[in-house]
Each structure stands twice: as C-alpha cells, then as structure tokens.
Amino acid sequence: MEPETEGPPPTIQVTPLQQMMASCAGAVVTSLMVTPLDVVKIRLQAQNNPFPKGKCFLYSNGLMDHICICEEESKKAWYKKPGNFHGTLDAFLKIVRNEGIKSLWSGLPPTLVMAVPATVIYFTCYEQLSTFLKTKLGENETRIPIVAGIVARFGAVTMISPLELIRTKMQSKTFSYKELYQIVSMKVSEDGWISLWKGWAPTILRDVPFSAMYWYNYENLRRWLCEKSDLYESTFMINFTAGALSGSFAAVATLPFDVVKTQKQTQLWTHEYCKFPEPLDMSTWSIMKNIVADRGFSGLFTGLIPRLVKIVPACAIMISSYELGKGFFQQQNVESR
C-alpha cells in the first residue's frame, strides 16, 4: 500500500478586522523605517535650493506622497533648519547629533492621519476582493491580483483625496471644526463637489497601474519562490524579496506618470496658494508633451534612482510586515479553535 502524499496544510483565514490591524501595524513600521530617507533628501534639497514662501514640495512617508507648502519665512520650519551637509550620510549623522534622532521623523505625524487609513483601506479591500474572486474564478486565476489591485487602489485614492486636500489647506493655520466646515462649504459652492478631488486624476493614473503590476508580480513571484524553496507557505524573506522586486518593476514602468503627477500637483497648489490664475491646459497629455518638448523622452524618466530608493524598501517592508501580522493572527486563530 502506497503512503499518502502530504498536501499543503489548510489555509487559516484571518478576519477583516485582523487584516486591518496587520495593515495598520505594517503602515506604521514602514513609515518609521522609510521617512528618514525622505527627510534627509528634503533637507539636502532645501540646503542647495532654499524653499521660498509658497513653494510646494513632496513629502513621502513611504505610504503616500503628500504636498507640503512652504509657509514660513523664518528658519523655524524643520525643512529650513541650517545644516551645512556634505552628502546623505553626513546629513544623517549631523541631524541626529545636532538636532536629536527625532528630527529624522520631522513632519511625519500629520501625514500619518491620511496615510495609515488609506493603507488599511487599500490592503483590506485587496484581501477581501481576492478572497471573493478566488471563490468565483478559482485559486490559480492569474487575473485576480490585477483586478483586485485596480479596484482596491481606485477606492482608497477616491476616499482619501478630499481629506488630503483639506490637510494641505490646513498647513498654514489651525482651524476649528466650524472654520473647517466653512472652508469646505465655500470650496464646494464656488467650484462644485468635484473640487474636493483636485489632484485625483494624476494620482489615479499613476497608482492604479502601479497597483495592478505590483500585486500581479508579487503574487506570482512569491508563488515561484515558494516552489523553488519547496515550501507551502512563504517566509518573511520570500515576502520581502517578492515585495522589493515587484515594487521596483512597477516603479520603473509607472515613472512617467509619477513625473507628470508631481509636476501637476505642485503647479496646482503653487497657483492656488499664490492666487495665480491656473494655466488653461493642465491635462496629463499636455504636461507630458511639454516635458518631452523641453527635455526629450528622457525627461519622463527623471528621478528614477530616487524613486527606486523610496519605493523598493517601502514595498518590501510594508508587505513583509503585513504578511508577518497576518501570520501572527492565523496562529492565534489556530490556537483558539
């Protein structure tokens, strides 16, 4: 009598609440690990080209890019502190030594109010959609990560965009809830409800293709690495590696949309803050044509290395932390049976 072949262990599902908790923990870990890289980059930029009042710049906490408006003429703002840095490593060391290690996370708390909920919505929606589609199409259907990634990212960006707009407006002044309501009401009455989603289109154009490519490559790379390692369940290193590689592929492929998004959003907010009339044509296609005309096709791939330095560790840390959290809850669910 032949021995029975051992199959994969049954998959222990985690609840939506547990998925939310795992993604929340992963989001916090990612932001704590990645934010110092962007803080140092911004400090170096401000040292070489000081930000004038009304200047917009991007701040990334590893989860989202946030538009920040330079409000203060003095050197009180964290990005205007003098440093006399000579390179990235020197900036790290001098900031820690002269200002304290907490300065590496300057500006982080206000952005987490948006970034953590967005990440929780995104990952939980992806998991729920994937589970639902697998029951309809089968476990090995390759289109599932693409569809789930597109829908989840579209929903997360759409839900968070109005809140991010409000956060950007509140940078210059602390508003009461009543004042905030009046500002939003005035904005809606002047420009309509659609005005609350200013900057939504370029974000969708970059993030939705990124999400589709990322999840498709991640799920397939993880499965392939497990097969090569003769494992049924992925390890922390497999998740980390698959996340890093998938993030790098998606970052390169969507770089032109990132260049357009950055330029469009900074122009929009600079014009709004300085009360300049907006250019008549700020469509994505128009901005792309202007970039190609000024700098050639290579202009659409400006900033590839900085984008990879930001995206690759963020994707690797986020997905491996998230899967680690899910594994913890799966173990808890097994023990509670």
UniProtKB/Swiss-Prot annotation:
Its main location: mitochondrion. GO terms for cellular component: mitochondrial inner membrane; mitochondrion. It holds the Pfam family Mito_carr. Solcar repeats lie at residues 14-132, 140-224, 234-328. The chain crosses the membrane at residues 20-40, 104-124, 146-166, 200-221, 240-260, 299-319. The keyword Glycosyltransferase does not apply. Keywords: Membrane, Mitochondrion, Mitochondrion inner membrane, Repeat, Transmembrane, Transmembrane helix, Transport. GO terms for molecular function: glutathione transmembrane transporter activity. One of its GO terms (biological process) is erythrocyte development. PROSITE patterns: SOLCAR. It is found in: Mitochondrion inner membrane. It is a multi-pass membrane protein. It catalyses: glutathione(in) = glutathione(out). Widely expressed at low level. Probable mitochondrial transporter required for glutathione import into mitochondria. Glutathione, which plays key roles in oxidative metabolism, is produced exclusively in the cytosol and is imported in many organelles. Mitochondrial glutathione is required for the activity and stability of proteins containing iron-sulfur clusters, as well as erythropoiesis. Belongs to the mitochondrial carrier (TC 2.A.29) family. This is Mitochondrial glutathione transporter SLC25A40. It comes from Rattus norvegicus (Rat). The gene is Slc25a40.
